[in-house]
């Protein structure tokens, strides 16, 4: 009979283990997940010898975070190993395992319902709450992100990472004042809390506080050195966005080379962050050299993924922008998969991802071979996708890439009145944005409004 070891995770939740040393691995998983620390990886070697439900479930989660077709088979193997061991476990551990099993099976709706129940019954299970937020985020369901975190407030109000979760939930719900308050509360407790820094960067970008946001992230950037590649690269991505808006294109390009695409070229989130930043740099008029060719070599293996529409669409743009035929393969796979997608995401795949994929392919191909460009087709397809864009997942800031590409296609198609109608409100909301002013200047010049172009 296996030994039963009773321990607690960092937030006092009981865990049932087979080996005393596994307690540190579970703590590393929880702290690493919430704080984007590489200690999250310690759960994998622990899972080799400890077949307890919580250890195997955490290992399954880690494999699912690969966001690739390789993840679910590995995750199922860990869940099966725990089932075969048939060891004791708490009800909370069983609920968490059930939520992860739903995720592995592709039933995100059932997984989210289980995470909501966990948040209500075990409000200090912040890892389960954050995982629930991850699912809601990928479905474009910001209110559920916020509601999950609010369940924890009475029990965990003095935990910095909870306020990071609250801040991002509020920000995605467009409640910027509350988002900033929670982010600053988290940072007062823990100045290097990366998710709170991230949420505050979102607030400042949306608020048009571009110089302030750039200075804030620049000052915080040394604190990202020990984080996972995603968090280090993603916060650097946010810093680069501020730099592009302010016209510091050279600094943004350096961040692309050194941080955003300089860490882990195999990981999904690092890859789409690189695609997004490189596209934004190019849209801002920056010559990026042969970077698309190099980036696309790491995307060629993604054509059969269909894990999340948000990911597939950016893989497709990167492949097409480099002129690779795999972009056509990925488009065909998106169209084939869309009617078969899990129920919770099927509408987003069919109504948003498919038209967006056509528009992205047309835009990228037009950039690769201008003589063969079909800018009206790119503009029309992207325009058809925009109303439902939130459903593909990603943040407001991340999805803005598709809006920028749509505007660019409209402008290249000569539809300047439509561009003016969309771009002038952006200029009003972002008076510090040199990028927006430059584009608006060209639009007004093309419209024969030189006085407005000079303004």
Feature map (PLM): residue ranges:
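Canonical positions in the second alpha-helix
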Residues: 46-47, 81-83, 117-118, 151-152, ...
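Inter-helical turn/loop elements of alpha-helical hairpins
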Residues: 2, 20-23, 28-50, 59-93, ...
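Helix-coil-helix junctions within alpha-helical repeat/solenoid scaffolds
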Residues: 241-453
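Internal metal/ion-chelating core segments
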Residues: 149-246
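Generic helix N-cap/helix-start motif at coil->alpha-helix transitions
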Residues: 19-25, 51-55, 89-95, 122-129, ...
């Amino acid at each position: 009979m296996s030994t039963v070891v009773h321990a607690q995770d960092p937030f006092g939740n009981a865990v049932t283990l087979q080996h005393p040393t596994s307690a540190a691995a579970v703590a590393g998983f929880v702290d690493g997940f919430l704080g984007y620390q590489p200690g999250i990886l310690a759960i994998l070697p622990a899972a080799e010898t400890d077949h307890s439900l919580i250890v195997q479930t955490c290992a399954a989660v880690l494999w699912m975070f690969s966001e690739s077709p390789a993840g679910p088979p590995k995750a199922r193997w860990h869940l099966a190993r725990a089932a075969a061991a048939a060891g004791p476990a708490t009800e909370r551990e069983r609920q968490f395992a059930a939520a992860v099993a739903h995720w592995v099976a592709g039933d995100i709706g059932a997984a989210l319902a289980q995470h909501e129940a966990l948040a209500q019954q075990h409000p200090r299970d912040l890892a389960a709450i954050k995982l629930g937020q991850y699912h809601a985020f990928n479905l474009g369901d910001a209110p559920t992100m916020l509601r999950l975190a609010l369940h924890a407030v009475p029990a965990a109000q003095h935990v910095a990472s909870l306020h990071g979760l609250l801040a991002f939930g509020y920000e995605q719900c467009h409640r910027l004042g509350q988002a900033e308050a929670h982010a600053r509360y988290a940072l007062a407790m823990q100045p290097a809390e990366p998710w709170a820094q991230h949420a505050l960067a979102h607030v400042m970008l949306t608020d048009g506080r571009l110089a302030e946001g750039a200075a804030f992230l620049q000052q915080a950037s040394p604190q990202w050195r020990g984080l996972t590649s995603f968090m280090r690269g993603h916060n650097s991505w946010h810093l680069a966005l501020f730099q592009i808006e302010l016209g510091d294109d050279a600094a943004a390009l350096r961040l692309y080379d050194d941080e955003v695409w300089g860490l882990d070229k195999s990981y999904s989130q690092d890859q789409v962050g690189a695609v997004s930043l490189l596209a934004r740099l190019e849209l801002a008029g920056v010559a990026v050299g042969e970077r698309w060719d190099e980036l696309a070599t790491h995307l060629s293996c993604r054509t059969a993924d269909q894990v999340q529409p948000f990911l597939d669409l950016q893989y497709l743009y990167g492949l097409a922008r480099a002129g690779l035929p795999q972009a056509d393969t990925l488009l065909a796979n998106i169209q084939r998969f869309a009617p078969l997608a899990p129920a919770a995401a099927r509408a987003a795949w069919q109504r948003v991802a498919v038209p967006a994929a056509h528009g992205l392919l047309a835009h990228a191909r037009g950039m690769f071979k201008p003589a063969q460009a079909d800018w009206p087709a790119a503009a029309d397809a992207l325009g058809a996708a925009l109303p439902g864009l939130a459903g593909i997942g990603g943040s407001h800031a991340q999805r803005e890439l598709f809006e920028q590409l749509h505007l660019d296609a409209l402008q290249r198609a000569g539809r300047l009145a439509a561009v003016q109608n969309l771009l002038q409100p952006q200029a009003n909301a972002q008076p510090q944005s040199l990028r927006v002013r430059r584009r608006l200047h060209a639009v007004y010049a093309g419209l024969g409004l030189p006085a407005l172009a000079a303004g």
